[in-house]
UniProtKB/Swiss-Prot annotation:
GO cellular component assignments: cytoplasm; mitotic spindle; nucleus; spindle microtubule
Disulfide bonds: none
Region Disordered: start-end pairs: 249-287, 397-418, 749-792
UniProt xrefs under InterPro entries: Kinesin-like_fam (IPR027640), Kinesin_motor_CS (IPR019821), Kinesin_motor_dom (IPR001752), Kinesin_motor_dom_sf (IPR036961), P-loop_NTPase (IPR027417)
Name of this protein: Kinesin-like protein KIF3C
Residue numbers spanned by region Globular: 628-792
Amino acid sequence: MASKTKASEALKVVARCRPLSRKEEAAGHEQILTMDVKLGQVTLRNPRAALGELPKTFTFDAVYDASSKQADLYDETVRPLVDSVLQGFNGTVFAYGQTGTGKTYTMQGTWVEPEQRGVIPNAFEHIFTHISRSQNQQYLVRASYLEIYQEEIRDLVSKEPGKRLELKENPETGVYIKDLSSFVTKNVKEIEHVMNLGNQTRAVGSTHMNEVSSRSHAIFVITVECSERGSDGQDHIRVGKLNLVDLAGSERQNKAGPNTTGGTATQPTGGGGGGGGGGGGGERPKEASKINLSLSALGNVIAALSGNRSTHIPYRDSKLTRLLQDSLGGNAKTIMVATLGPASHSYDESLSTLRFANRAKNIKNKPRVNEDPKDTLLREFQEEIARLKAQLEKKGMLGKRLRRKSSRRKKAVSAPAGYPEGPVIEAWVAEEEDDNNNNHRPPQPILETALDKNMENYLQEQKERLEEEKAAIQDDRSLVSEEKKKLLEEKEKMLEDLRREQEATELLAAKYKAMESKLLIGGRNIMDHTNEQQKMLELKRQEIAEQKRREREMQQEMMLRDEETMELRGTYTSLQQEVEVKTKKLKKLYAKLQAVKAEIQDQHDEYIRVRQDLEEAQNEQTRELKLKYLIIENFIPPEEKNKIMNRLFLDCEEEQWKFQPLVPSGANSSQMKKRPTSAVGYKRPISQYARVAMAMGSHPRYRAENIMFLELDVSPPAVFEMEFSHDQDQDPRALHMERLMRLDSFLERPSTSKVRKSRSWCQSPQRPPPPTAHASLAASAALRPTTVLDHE
């Protein structure tokens, strides 16, 4: 039991309060938060409290007020965690709080001003400074940047930032993200470039409480792999992972609604995140709902971990809790920074944040060193570099041997008298050169440079020699033209082979140098004296931070013991003094009782509010479900619905329903699908009528279906004349009725009893003559009334 307690480590919680903003000061909001930096206490006063109600006090590992600096937070709280990551532990730093309380400022800060840099840029400087000061160690640093936007995981530094990534789980390595891009970085500038590239595509928006509000949870992952030679003579690799989490703020829609006057409302990632200022109002409720649901799931996980009775930890309720599974109750060291707003209108949110942080203090993690894992990229790099180096050395030795042969030829020609000729001289020269090389063997980097130079010199010499031989062949007039052409082709081929060999060697050398440059080796090109001074300063800074922490813990312990001592002292000089002391103690206990009752009432109110929110969300989902059921029942045939229902299955890893593929995965996808039975042997389906027509011999080209083609028969337009009476004494109404009756009698003339086949005028054998202009005018004149009624 003792070993188990020793191996566990509590989650470290610190609180930070921002100053009042200009908008809050102009609105007349008062400050309700008091920070005691020495004791690590936060006191929250209720602006709507009744007379005599005591303020609420919370105690944390460290407290930073509005006057605190970014360097203070990093040096005292975060630096020991990053040192642990460099030793092979997993570490997580995440900021939690209401929107507009300074989470992004705490994690990122202002990149231009060094004093206002946040946790992430300070961690960059810390990691690469440590690597440059280390000795006899090789490092590989990788960086990834992702966000969780509306419960979708997106890669911020990918070429397709809007692509949705899948969350997977491996029994050996734990939870991981499939196809997440990772960049190998060699210095602070490169890793800052990865960070800036991801910030350009992260979802942000403007609300009433914050002009640049984070609309997604962002996680910047730094993986540090270290290789060091152990006492057994073998290389041992440690892998540390640092998760830097910038959570989106919890918010209420009535306070943090969309800021329609702020111009662009969102800078979405890829295809998500909302539109401009007008469209932001529709996206903000969705974003806020997803943010609050994921933060609620995070709160449920912390509540389950802080309580001893819970046996089930709901990690799968959210993508955020799945990714932070190792950081919450796992094998990582974790720091939580609770950011607070001091204004009176943020009382409820500040109280909720303080309670959340107070529960998180009870979480226990069991950190361990990740030593010699199987999937280290550093080991793969080392093996690949060794293979490329062997190939380069082989090519260098080959060039050296070829160069020796050419030099031997020259020496053999000018051999002194008394020595044998031929291979003996060549062997003697080779042995002499080998002895000289063994006696004066250069160091490893000089050897690599020498090999490269020797290979380049050899290739250059061979090129010059081939060019000279080509020129000599062209100038030699004793050769026949065919022989000269053949020799020139051979020399040209040799020159082309030489060029290819040179290109292959250069490509191999470039690949070797590129991979070797990605490995960071500590202690190179750094002055030892400066290193020692920096190390001493670092140790002193850590000692000061540790001393402050111990002093704060001792003061908290002294306060508790003073209260216990006051209770134990029971000596009184008189009954009156005893009554006064006990009355004071009774009032103090009564105040504590009232504070506990108020806390219980607040918890009850919060429970009711959360329950109402859940009921509202459930009603909304039920309403949407009924609508979709109604659409399915009225617009989708039952057989199609059954086909869809038979293909559905639940993916337990992603907690989503998915469709099974129509073609089984085991089948050969390259095999052509069979045509339907109605089209066997034909290019397209053919009806039975067309098949019969084909059997009868008629042309079935346009007879794909049993459709009758009937010709239309349109009669030519009939022109008739209407006779009207010119009796001026007749009543105008009667005259008008007479005209209508004549027109009706013409329209209702009996049709012939013969049924004619319809035929269009263009298909009729005798087309009617086109009406002339005179006939048209005559017809129109006949239809117009020719009499003028005079009512005078």
